[in-house]
Amino acid sequence: MPILLEHIQLNDEDLKDTKHLAEILKYKNNSIKTIINVLEWEDSNIRYCYEKSNVYYFITFFIIVGLVWAIFPEVWLWCEQVFCISPTIHIIICCLYFIITIILFLFLCGVVGTFLHLWATFFTLSKCDSKILKLKEGLFTTLSLIWISTSLKTILKTKYAICRDYAKLTSAILHNLNIKHYFLVYPTHVAVAVKIDDYYYVIDQKLPIYKIDVWLKKLGKEKVKIYTPVDIYNSKLKFVEKYYKNENNLKSEISDDILRKIEEDVKKELQIKNAEQYNKKVEPIPVKLSIPIENYDEITHYSIVRVISKEIYNKFLTNIKNVSNIEIKKDEGKFAVNVYYEIPNSIPNSK
């Protein structure tokens, strides 16, 4: 679905619905950590709605194929009257028309199936006592969600979003916290960015914060249009510039001192103490990460620390207390972690 600037327009209700959340995510006297909190909250609480994203493609294709299917018989009858068409070609054309009919039916099934899937999901999640009320609430929520411009109230209620919803939510939170921000806009994608020391850092659905050049490389793009809100409601977006990827900002070198600094900060996050006393005979457990080395700088540092900490914690959960040490290293241009996990000597009796 093409991104229109109207899709990320805010209103009073959007700002009101996100004000409390913004206050919760605010980190005192540290705008960078506040932004990381916003991004981590979205990463942990909002799920990308592939159903909503796909349904627009289904509908678009359905309309195009449907128009072809509708006008084809008239065009074909006209061709038969004007031209001399052999029986073989007639059979081939009939077969093609039959295939188009099947494709049209399949895409119709896709649209209906996606709608019913979302309806059933929200029917199940509804807290209403009556089944009739559950059906009504599920239907209303589904229609609200798949609408082109979804309200933030619906996004926060359903915890489903696509890129423009993420951007709208991020913008509303940052507006409430008086943090100046920008929109990076493609025909099919939009993200939010902040400018620190004359350089753009991108907030795009998941941790970590990305340097704009690394973000462009990740998307396989060479340039992006940048806009800034003229007023608090994004009712007008002012074009700022067209940013072109700068290869000079894509360096995959990182010093051992920085790796040790990341290592120490991850240990603090996970409360790993006395790491120097770990058993070196323990075979490390490798944890691969998708964060490129070239994304590191002082601004992205803490967001990278949070990603690594979450990956390790999600792997070991409450057994994180048995992790005696970690080592951060480079692996094919990306960060990687060796986790030293020591199995306790005794297992508690389950009786």
UniProtKB/Swiss-Prot annotation:
Gene3D superfamilies: 3.10.620.30. InterPro entries: Transglutaminase-like_domain. The chain crosses the membrane at residues 58-78, 91-111. GO terms for cellular component: plasma membrane. The keyword Zinc does not apply. The keyword NAD does not apply. It is found in: Cell membrane. Belongs to the UPF0252 family. This is UPF0252 protein MJECL39. It comes from Methanocaldococcus jannaschii (strain ATCC 43067 / DSM 2661 / JAL-1 / JCM 10045 / NBRC 100440). The lineage of its organism: Archaea, Methanobacteriati, Methanobacteriota, Methanomada group, Methanococci.
